[in-house]
From Swiss-Prot:
It is found in: Cytoplasm, Cytoskeleton. Belongs to the actin family. ARP1 subfamily. The keyword Transcription does not apply. It comes from Drosophila melanogaster. It holds the Pfam family Actin. PANTHER family: ACTIN (PTHR11937). This is Actin-like protein 53D. SUPFAM superfamilies: Actin-like ATPase domain.
Length: 376
């Protein structure tokens, strides 16, 4: 694929999906993101004049992941919300460098979590216009974009990434905020839980670098059980994972015990709803006339919904809670890890969307509060 994009091409734009764990970026109207990298900023663990001159003050993304042994890794986004704007700015700068794009050349569409605080949206708008000097800007709700990626405008999105899980009912392209449920349990919590389960086996994975290895183990070997109690009795099939230093870790029931927390958060000591319960709660909070459509259009989205068997277990557990006559359909696209980005690319390329952009003139006239008027 060419590394260039024609800025004069029809409705070209930069699309950036800011995930808590992974940043996905590329150009509209392309189908897949060109840059996918960890949303991490690494800083040297120990002050070392020689080392500092070699790797600089901070390292972003893949480079930070590669040098994790000598770095302390930080995530600028926690539970879907930006917590450190200076580091977030570094991640965006790195994004444009990877895309080999000048921010001043193309409009930028960024994503946000549902129920994102107003001040966060304003800060994002301010940075994009003031620091990056983009010609036009828009911020869209992640779950809505996931729904667009499936060609729907009505349905409920169960979006679980690294930092947060949301169940978001959407009607005619608009999220219904009163029925959204946010659960602060997602991929990062499952990684921590797997660290704890490995500790029970006598394997200590405590540093931020070792946690990244555990995340890789989780993504490669874990799966969702259809019958947790029964499989616990059978202890699960054993798999071996080889660490970079050659040491081998044996995993048995940990492989399904880890993602089980999505359905039974009490395993983590959390008093929150499982993903099937949160979905049921969201649908129940919708208008009676919408519920049938919601049950028939459930869309799984985000990296933490990529576990094998998750859609079958989800359907099984939700069916037990739903009215007996209701038809439930769960959409689990193989590309759902990138569905937010894909939906953003689709939206930014629509002719009908072009008058939705906030342009620099509007920003100069109104300021960052313009984002509430044009992005909802």
């Amino acid at each position: 694929m060419s590394s260039e994009v024609d800025s004069n091409s029809h409705h070209a734009a930069v699309v950036i999906d800011n995930g808590s764990g992974v940043c996905k970026a590329g150009f509209s109207p392309e189908d897949t993101p060109r840059a996918v990298f960890p949303s991490i900023v690494g800083r040297p663990r120990h002050l070392n004049v020689l080392l500092d001159s070699v790797i600089g003050d901070s390292v972003i993304g893949e480079a930070a992941a590669r040098k994790r042994g000598i770095l302390t890794l930080k995530y600028p986004i926690e539970h879907g919300m930006v917590k450190n704007w200076d580091e977030m700015e570094m991640v965006w700068q790195h994004t444009y460098e990877l895309l080999r794009a000048d921010p001043m050349d193309l409009p930028a569409l960024l994503t946000e979590a549902p129920l994102n605080p107003k001040k966060n949206r304003e800060k994002m708008t301010e940075i994009m216009f003031e620091h990056f000097q983009v010609p036009a800007f828009y911020v869209a709700v992640q779950a809505v974009l996931s729904l667009y990626a499936t060609g729907r405008t009505v349905g409920i999105v169960v979006d679980s990434g690294d930092g947060v899980t949301h169940t978001v009912p959407i009607y005619e392209g608009f999220a219904l905020p009163h029925a959204c449920v946010r659960v602060d349990l997602a991929g990062r919590d499952l990684t921590d839980y797997l660290c704890k389960l490995l500790l029970e086996r006598g394997v200590t994975m405590g540093t931020s670098a070792e946690r990244e290895i555990v995340r890789e183990i989780k993504e490669k070997l874990c799966y969702v059980s259809m019958n947790y109690a029964k499989e616990m009795d059978l202890h699960g099939k054993v798999e071996t994972y080889e660490l970079p230093d050659g040491q081998k870790i044996v995993l048995g029931c940990e492989r399904f015990r880890c993602p089980e927390a999505l359905f039974q958060p009490s395993l983590l000591g959390q008093e929150v709803m499982g993903i099937h319960e949160a979905t049921h709660h969201s649908i129940t909070n919708c208008d009676m006339d919408l519920r049938k459509d919601m049950y028939a259009n459930i869309v799984l989205s985000g990296g933490t919904t990529m576990f094998r068997n998750i859609e079958h277990r989800f359907l099984q557990d939700l069916t037990e809670m739903a009215p007996p006559s209701i038809r439930i359909k769960v959409n689990a696209s193989p590309d759902r890890r990138f569905s937010v980005w894909t939906g953003g690319s689709v939206l930014a390329s629509l002719t009908s969307f072009q008058n939705m952009w906030i342009d620099s003139l509007e920003y100069e006239e109104v300021g960052s509060a313009i984002v509430h008027r044009k992005c909802f």
